[in-house]
UniProtKB/Swiss-Prot annotation:
The lineage of its organism: Eukaryota, Fungi, Dikarya, Ascomycota, Pezizomycotina. Disruption phenotype: Abolishes the production of the spirocyclic sesquiterpene alpha-acorenol. It comes from Gibberella fujikuroi (strain CBS 195.34 / IMI 58289 / NRRL A-6831). The gene is Ffsc6. Its cofactor is Mg(2+). This is Terpene cyclase 6. It comes from the Eukaryota.
Amino acid sequence: MPHKDLPIRPLVRAFDPVGPDTLGPPDLDFASLFRERNVPEDAPLTLYPEQLNVPWHTSLPWTRQSKWWVQGEAAGRDLVNRISADKASERGALPVEFMDERRKGKIDELVEDAVSCAVYLYPSSSPTRIELLTQALLLLFFHDDVMERGATQDDATVCDDFVTMIPKNKHMKRYFAEVLECDPILGPGLLRAIGLFVNAGRKKSPFKQDKYATLAEYLDYRRHDIAKPFMIAAIRFGSGVRQTPEETAPFAELEDLYVQHSILINDLYSYDKEMYEARTINGSVVNAVHVIEKLMCVPPHLAKTITRTMSFDVEKKYYAESERFMRDPALNDKQRTYVIALFDCLTGNLFHHATLGRYSRYAEYVFDCKT
């Protein structure tokens, strides 16, 4: 089996949301841009998804995985257990499943989601940064779940401490201190980005807006997704590279393309789960596949195919933009590291979605992984 002597994170199942008659991806030579010539010993693992029996319909050549997934998982589980053990007056609302026999399964799901996201999207992060990013993601997923499934979407959670940047909950005080100790320069940006996500979500809840007149309207709404500041702050914190605003300014278009691709991938891979929850618990469907299906009066399979084709178009634009930077001799080392970190997020986001249990259990085309 591949990687048997390396700390690959175990995979169980993967899935393809479209199926065997999917369109082929564009032929783009990302490998020539991002292949490392001299790989350091502490480098992330490079995974070739098809060797692991993960369906990989994309022009992206590989994904990378952090070696520190065990530490990330332990940190995430520790935080959610500490929060859930608090009195209700101290920790605010919890996901509804925490109140009954579904508690363990829900904790496992949240931790798996956060760890998977952290180790594939931010693979070059140090062990401490992986732990803190896993916890950050878990807090966002935890809060998001309360907002989506709560009766009013106005319930307070521990994440509301990030809005004021003055934590009251003892676990949030500890988290703030650990982030700032790890990186006093980039840490505040990560904490503020979590606060922006929480605050914006209350004012512009995606769960309250699920009808769009045009596809362009939907895509514009998602391009300004409430998660975008966090997505970018997490990349910067994970890489640990401190850059001036002048050094990061040239990458605005590359960042935007990364966000666009991430949104399309998320919508494509989460569609079946969203539709199931719409039928069973009256959940809202905020999804490009659904918008295409309704506006164009096409069946779900065709809407998924169109969504995947749109992601291919973004990959073409991303390749052109990243080629411009990676072949530019004027690019300094810090800027190059950031471009590579963005590419890791692009590939990692796809792998994360394709192997995530909370999505694969609703899928039709599921495969056992080989790890």
